[in-house]
Design a protein with these regions (language model features):
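Conserved active-site and SAM-binding loop architecture
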Residues: 1-103
């Protein structure tokens, strides 16, 4: 199975995928420290930084399992709940990536 992740963090999904014998094709994480962790542990996986600037069409039909958790701050009761007015409102970018990848 081929796995890829969006909003990857430090790679919990990648570790689980590896434990199941899956191949980690790519990860996408904007924060520098988590991205460095991912690059260290998964050097054969392509690394993307900014989901808003990444074209995923090259992965169309090549990913079996796509994982990811888009930022929840725009909706969180702990925050200001600005929804689409929050610059962290990235659900539309995740949907675009899903459509391009078509897992």
């Amino acid at each position: 199975m081929n796995h890829a992740s969006l909003f990857s963090g430090i790679g919990g999904a990648e570790v689980a995928a590896s434990m199941m014998g899956w191949q980690n094709l790519f990860h996408c994480e904007i924060q520098e420290f988590p991205r460095k962790v991912l690059q260290y542990w998964f050097p054969n996986s392509e690394s993307y930084e900014d989901i808003t600037k990444t074209d995923f069409t090259k992965w169309h039909g090549k990913v079996d399992v796509l994982t990811g958790g888009f930022p929840c701050q725009p909706f969180s009761v702990a925050g200001r709940r600005k929804g689409a007015d929050d610059n962290r409102y990235l659900w539309p970018q995740m949907l675009r990536a899903i459509r391009q990848i078509h897992p």
